[in-house]
């Protein structure tokens, strides 16, 4: 059996990044975790001096249509200031983040997918060597032994064309096109932006809106594709 066939039989790691901060990565990660019955890991958490952190947010977010209780793994690094990891380290000089420190949690049974939520966007600096989120994604591809894919979360409204295309093209230029599941647009549905992005070759996985009722949650979960269908699509492409 070749390595590609072996990877296809393994549960994937899906890295969720965004076009900006506060675009809804944690909300979308929550939906994906419940849709796919996945585990969750936030490798680097910042801003814990004033916020409970995304792991707690995801844990406390109740999905009425789901009985799944996701395994949630502790961040490798948790920094106090609500800044990029590089900037947050300036306030904690004893912390020195290195890519080699990021190892897939041993507690992950690999019986289900693992959703990994990044900090900010693809160019956010993570280490003192100025390694960025994209470098972390590559590191996981090289070291995890599992197929690794990327989901980009973007706003649905005005300005998303520029931000989404910059992010998409950056990932493609860094050799990650074959790892891209696609983009999830978060916010009020905007079919014009969907069609415009498709013209540039961007795969739109779904549009999701903020859920205010259990019915809304059920509808959003139903609209999201299965991880198996996405992996099959990547194999065909």
UniProtKB/Swiss-Prot annotation:
Pathway: Cofactor biosynthesis; biotin biosynthesis; biotin from 7,8-diaminononanoate: step 1/2. The keyword Magnesium applies. Its EC number is 6.3.3.3. The keyword Glycoprotein does not apply. Gene3D superfamilies: P-loop containing nucleotide triphosphate hydrolases. One of its GO terms (biological process) is biotin biosynthetic process. The active site is at residue 42. InterPro entries: DTB_synth_BioD, P-loop_NTPase. Disulfide bonds: none annotated. Keywords: ATP-binding, Biotin biosynthesis, Ligase, Magnesium, Metal-binding, Nucleotide-binding. GO terms for molecular function: ATP binding; dethiobiotin synthase activity; magnesium ion binding. Its cofactor is Mg(2+). It catalyses: (7R,8S)-7,8-diammoniononanoate + CO2 + ATP = (4R,5S)-dethiobiotin + ADP + phosphate + 3 H(+). It holds the Pfam family AAA_26. It comes from the Eukaryota. Mg(2+) binds at residues 26, 117. ATP binds at residues 22-27, 117-120, 184-185, 213-215, 220. HAMAP family: BioD. Belongs to the dethiobiotin synthetase family. Dethiobiotin synthetase involved in the biotin biosynthesis pathway. This is Dethiobiotin synthetase. It comes from Saccharomyces cerevisiae (strain ATCC 204508 / S288c) (Baker's yeast). The gene is BIO4.
